[in-house]
From Swiss-Prot:
GO terms for molecular function: rRNA binding; structural constituent of ribosome. Disulfide bonds: none annotated. Gene3D superfamilies: 3.30.70.330. NCBIfam families: PRK05738.1-3 (NF004359), PRK05738.2-4 (NF004363), PRK05738.3-1 (NF004365), PRK05738.3-2 (NF004366), PRK05738.3-4 (NF004368). GO terms for biological process: translation. It comes from Prochlorococcus marinus (strain MIT 9215). This is Large ribosomal subunit protein uL23. Keywords: Ribonucleoprotein, Ribosomal protein, RNA-binding, rRNA-binding. Belongs to the universal ribosomal protein uL23 family. Pfam families: Ribosomal_L23. One of the early assembly proteins it binds 23S rRNA. One of the proteins that surrounds the polypeptide exit tunnel on the outside of the ribosome. Forms the main docking site for trigger factor binding to the ribosome.
Length: 100
């Protein structure tokens, strides 16, 4: 991979999504991340494999609708988010929570 491509991979993944549904999916070896809305599935797969040194089996993405936000009489929209559910190979793990 080129150096420019490697620096782009770090910008693809924004943050992990920590919800009840996403936490329950950890038992199925599926991890949920908020990603750049322009990222494609191969980019997301390459970014996860490069950043966490794991083998990705599949990537599912979703673009939920933008939510409207009002401040007084002014109406606007929240920024576009894209979620990716990444399924890892058997035996691979990503450490999201610190060990106690």
């Amino acid at each position: 991979m080129t150096k420019l491509f490697d620096s782009r991979l770090a910008d693809v993944i924004r943050k992990p999504v920590i919800t009840e549904k996403a936490t329950n999916a950890l038992d199925l070896n599926q991890y949920t991340f908020e990603v750049d809305h322009r990222a494609a599935k191969p980019e997301i797969k390459a970014a996860i494999e490069a950043l966490f040194s794991v083998k990705v089996i599949g990537v599912n993405t979703m673009n939920p609708p933008r939510r409207t936000r009002r401040v007084g009489k002014f109406s606007g929209k929240r920024s576009q988010v894209k979620k990716a559910i990444v399924r890892l190979a058997e035996g691979d793990k990503i450490q999201l929570f610190p060990e106690s």
